[in-house]
Amino acid sequence: MADQQKAGGCPVMHGAMTQVGESNLDMWPNALNLDILHQHDRKPDPMGEGFNYREEVKKLDLDAVKQDLHQLMTDSQAWWPADWGHYGGLMIRMAWHAAGTYRVADGRGGGGTGNQRFAPINSWPDNVNLDKARRLLWPIKKKYGNRLSWADLIILAGNVAYESMGLKTFGFSLGREDIWHPEKDIYWGSEKEWLAPSDSEDSRYGEDRASLENPLAAVMMGLIYVNPEGVDGNPDPLRTAEDVRITFERMAMNDEETVALTAGGHTVGKCHGNGDVENLGPDPESADVEEQGLGWNNKVTRGVGRDTVSSGIEGAWTTYPTRWDNGYFHLLLNYEWELTKSPAGAWQWEPVDIKEEDKPVDVEDPSIRLNPIMTDADMAMKMDPAYRKISERFYNDPAYFDEVFARAWFKLTHRDLGPRTRYIGPEAPQEDLIWQDPVPAGRTDYDVEALKAKIADSGLSIGEMVSTAWDSARTFRGSDNRGGANGARIRLAPQKDWEGNEPERLSKVLGVLEGIAADAGASLADTIVLAGNVGIEQAARAAGHDITVPFAPGRGDASQEMTDVDSFQYLEPLADGYRNWVKKEYAVQPEEMMLDRTQLMGLTAPEMTVLVGGMRVLGTNHGGTKHGVLTDREGQLTNDFFVNLTDMAYTWKPVGSNRYEIRQRSSDAVKWTATRVDLVFGSNSILRSYAEVYAQDDNREKFVHDFVAAWTKVMNADRFDLVA
């Protein structure tokens, strides 16, 4: 039959969807996207179950890798020649644009996963020709194989590039594990086109620049930071300064770090715009198969060397673009600059009456000197009063600039790696930095059973103990490895005053647990978690299950001085579906906020399901509300939530915003009340399938064991000392 196929017909009998077409979310756009909870599992991972990158990378000869990288920097390839014979600027841009996607609001983005290899980031307009940088690195990745991830190599290449040009870097840590497909959880914006202006449909802006939609940091879809030509492509350094400040604040950088990173990033390398942008081919994801994953290929003109087109802006920022020095500030502050356009038609600034010796040479012919350039963002470093003051200090104190930049670069490239306990390798700095959320080591030599007995006799209720432990641990974000129960920061500002933590109830519970912890010689962090375990064990016994909740001592107690209050504000929960609470009404539904929190905590959909069902019957609702407490046996760890939610003896009636009554069909009498977060486990077809499992008569014990396993996972999420 094969030879009878019609020309153009599909030989596959459509047994599986192998191309992207209409998905369930296309057909039902308001459905919960549970896929974000099940990304990056082992199925697409070619390394297999037994592979542990964080153990494998410890075998890496870092010195040998760095030696190879140093050699690569000046080994210009004919297929993509190095500017001035040095790839440093290209490698720094690659590393910068990997790390620079990080945003502090949700901890997502950053260089910790090697996601620059995949769409959409590999094809962003701001990343034109970074595919060439990664291909230049391929021989090194191939050589060191499983001991060196792409994520580590990309950042390391940027670090070595700076070192090769004369900067003393602050340090470097290995340990970034690659993903194998694009993330599904990161919201990059709602725009339907690249570089859509701020007045477009689905804009990320409201009335002013400060209204940039959370959690976004970049000003446009497809940019890493700000538009280098100006706001919406209109040059105005003071307006651009506002964008720069907002964007870098959302990357957890202050003004001094912002100036240092801008200047340090533009001390080396150049922009590329000596040609017609229209001559560039499709981006990597859109390119034909014979392009082998390379994009933006110019098949009309030469398209490499001095004729390369990337951003469209053309020129170097400094006189010596392959040397770390203070030349950026020398040119920026000592010359007047005028607005011009590049050969590609992009807005840029060029100096007026510049001395010939201050001009950089051509990338291919050192006998030719050309004007340096500044972007609108660079001019903001001169025109904005606060940025200008910092720029002048850096100009007058080069050693101070070197130190601030080295530290800011380290922060940029390591922010999403988490605390120092996760650092690997001989170049990992030993200094504790406040943005790492340091936690001192805790004790493990106390009597855990004696401590449990004292907690059990404390008079605290099951709900009080479980809620406090949960609130302490739920701040964990797997996106940037921040938050969690370790450190007991729930007793410190700002967490002790968060509405979601019920400050009055929290103060009472902590007052009891602090004394017990001190008497036992245990940390408060351990005691809070252990109290939650005690509450669960009591509730399980009351339901007829004798179970011990696993516990690993060793958490420490952080001090207020170790806690960056401003940075921790971003970890404040605005809703917690597990405790059936929403701070106020938002544009997104409560169940969507629960899904986002679940993904950040690293939980699966079944784990989310069993935890919600268990928390409801333990009396942990915020403020003691009874919404979703679908049981007559509160305080016992039963599967009643699922049994009653799936029971067709009841109907569900809306009675207000996010409020429902569960009524008996036979009498229409109100039996319970609930919220959307409760009812979604019966209405969403996937979540209902999990709810039915836990409602089954033969799964009462499975429910308890699964709840305890998921609970323990949350309590230990930030225990990096327990894993490789």
UniProtKB/Swiss-Prot annotation:
InterPro entries the record matches: Catalase_peroxidase, Haem_peroxidase, Haem_peroxidase_sf, Peroxidases_AS
Entry's cofactor comment: Binds 1 heme b (iron(II)-protoporphyrin IX) group per dimer.
Residues at the site labelled Transition state stabilizer: R93
MF (Gene Ontology): catalase activity; heme binding; metal ion binding
Keyword DNA damage appears in the UniProt entry: no
PTMs per UniProt: Formation of the three residue Trp-Tyr-Met cross-link is important for the catalase, but not the peroxidase activity of the enzyme.
Enzyme Commission code(s) on record: 1.11.1.21
Cellular component terms (Gene Ontology): cytosol
Tryptophyl-tyrosyl-methioninium (Trp-Tyr) (with M-251) cross-link, chain position(s): W96-Y225
Cross-link Tryptophyl-tyrosyl-methioninium (Tyr-Met) (with W-96): residue positions: Y225-M251
Stated role: Bifunctional enzyme with both catalase and broad-spectrum peroxidase activity.
Name of the protein in its database record: Catalase-peroxidase
Source organism per UniProt: Halorhodospira halophila (strain DSM 244 / SL1) (Ectothiorhodospira halophila (strain DSM 244 / SL1))
